[in-house]
Structures are given as structure tokens and as C-alpha cells.
Amino acid sequence: MGQKVHPKGFRLGLTSEWDAQWFNEKKYSEYLLEDEAIRNFIKKNYNQAGIARVFVQRPDAERVLVSIYAARPGILIGKKGAGITELRQALEANFNRKFGIDIIELKTPETEASLVAESIAQKIEKRASYKIVMKRAITAALRRGARGIKIMVSGRLAGAEIARTEWYLKGRLPLQTLRSVIDYSTARAETKYGTIGIKVWIYKGDQNI
């Protein structure tokens, strides 16, 4: 039986990066939980911004620097930067720390696995055909520069009595090659028939390591 490894975890320090940059021996677990709470807070309140990644840095015990990678940064920035001020104040009120915020625009959101997975989940929840949604996502990713993409959905697809798994793969997907830059993410669609799981792998090319 084949053993599966997380595509991003497999490449950490080579072609993929950690989602946080800090070290603390005594408060490691506390900071780790707080990082996740910060990410959940931002994604929940600014879901329409198309947030693919929230990178957290802690230069000292009191300050937290947050870099937000978004497909629609204007929603976060707001008019004359008012949105950033509002977000910073909300974070400081909820987490009792000083926050610095940096917004980075994603040039090709169609090749971000997390955004593709979330988009598919939202469309399936709205009763769109999972086959059409998957094929359109694959076409869009390849058109925007992806070298290969695989999408897998599992569950009671189209309301079927028996759960099953279906997947589409187009292009290359060299999962065993460490220099290959592979983005991976998962999402869940909650339908009246039950939960449908979505997994997305996107191959973006090779990187010198």
C-alpha cells in the first residue's frame, strides 16, 4: 500500500516556506494556537478578499507582524487605507498585542491551491455540477501558467447513495521530485447530503535547490 506524504511539508526549507517565523521555548504552544486564531479571524472576517496565506512573524514578545497574501487586496486596504487601520485595531483588541500589517497582492489567484479548493467548495455548496466546476478550475489554472494540476473530490457526489472519489489530472505532477514547486490545499463543502472533501495539487515548475 502506498504511503502518502504532505506535498508542502515534504519540501519545507527547499521549495516551500513555513507559515510563521519565530521561536520561543517557553510559549511555543501558546504562540502556535494564537497564530491559528489570528489566521482564522482574518479569513473569517475578510473572506471576500480571497486570502491564500497569512504569514506571521514575532520580532519580540509584544509585536506581531502579519503578511496577508490576497487576490483582492482592495477589500482589505479600504478607502485611503482605512481598512488596514480597522483590521489592525480589531486584531489588537482581540489578541492584546501590537500588530503590523502588510498586504501582498496575488497576481495569479487561479494557481493558488487554497483559493482553488475554497472556490470549488463554495460552488458545490451552491449545487453547481462538481464535474463542470473541476474542469473549469483546471482550465483556468493551466491558462495562468500552472504546469500541472490535480483536483480530487470525495463524498456523496451529486447526492449519490454511496460515497465515492473522483479526480481529474492535467499536465505534470512530479510529487517525488523535491525541486518541483507544488502547492497543495484542502477544503470542505457542506451539502444537504453530507460533507464533500476537496484536495488540490498545483505544479508550478522547478526551482534550483
UniProtKB/Swiss-Prot annotation:
Pfam families: KH_2 (PF07650), Ribosomal_S3_C (PF00189). Keywords: Ribonucleoprotein, Ribosomal protein, RNA-binding, rRNA-binding. GO terms for molecular function: mRNA binding; rRNA binding; structural constituent of ribosome. GO terms for biological process: translation. GO terms for cellular component: cytosolic small ribosomal subunit. InterPro entries: KH_dom (IPR004087), KH_dom-like_a/b (IPR015946), KH_dom_type_2 (IPR004044), KH_sf_prok-type (IPR009019), Ribosomal_S3_C_sf (IPR036419), Ribosomal_uS3_bac-typ (IPR005704), Ribosomal_uS3_C (IPR001351), Ribosomal_uS3_CS (IPR018280). Residues 38-107 form the KH type-2 domain. Belongs to the universal ribosomal protein uS3 family. HAMAP family: Ribosomal_uS3_B. Part of the 30S ribosomal subunit. Forms a tight complex with proteins S10 and S14. This is Small ribosomal subunit protein uS3. It comes from Fervidobacterium nodosum (strain ATCC 35602 / DSM 5306 / Rt17-B1).
